[in-house]
Amino acid sequence: MSRVKRGVTARARHKKVLDQAKGYRGRRKNVYRIAKQAVMKAGQYAYRDRRQRKRQFRALWIARINAAAREVGLTYSTFMNGLKKAAIEVDRKVLADLAVFDKPAFAALADQARAKLAA
């Protein structure tokens, strides 16, 4: 049985971690043991925040829709209820975009929602 020397694989593993830690401050960028922990924590934050980003954007869209709906005399919940009754299936991302960049189109949707709520 021949002897296995680990120098090449260890160096490759260390290099991989230190490359991932590029741009970090202090010893986190050039000390393997500390960089490894920093890279692992960064990965945990990235995993968590990829999920939180979806929640945060949905909350932002709802806040924008609510603000625009109140400008035309509705609340968010009544506006969304009116759209549902009018069978208008526009997602919150598009509604928020209309609320910010195309106010007349948003007002037209609000009028349709209001008409269905009154009926």
Swiss-Prot record:
Binds directly to 23S ribosomal RNA and is necessary for the in vitro assembly process of the 50S ribosomal subunit. It is not involved in the protein synthesizing functions of that subunit. Disulfide bonds: none annotated. HAMAP family: Ribosomal_bL20. GO terms for cellular component: ribonucleoprotein complex; ribosome. GO terms for biological process: ribosomal large subunit assembly; translation. The gene is rplT. Belongs to the bacterial ribosomal protein bL20 family. This is Large ribosomal subunit protein bL20. Coiled coil: none annotated. Gene3D superfamilies: 6.10.160.10, Ribosomal protein L20. GO terms for molecular function: rRNA binding; structural constituent of ribosome. Keywords: Ribonucleoprotein, Ribosomal protein, RNA-binding, rRNA-binding. It comes from the Bacteria.
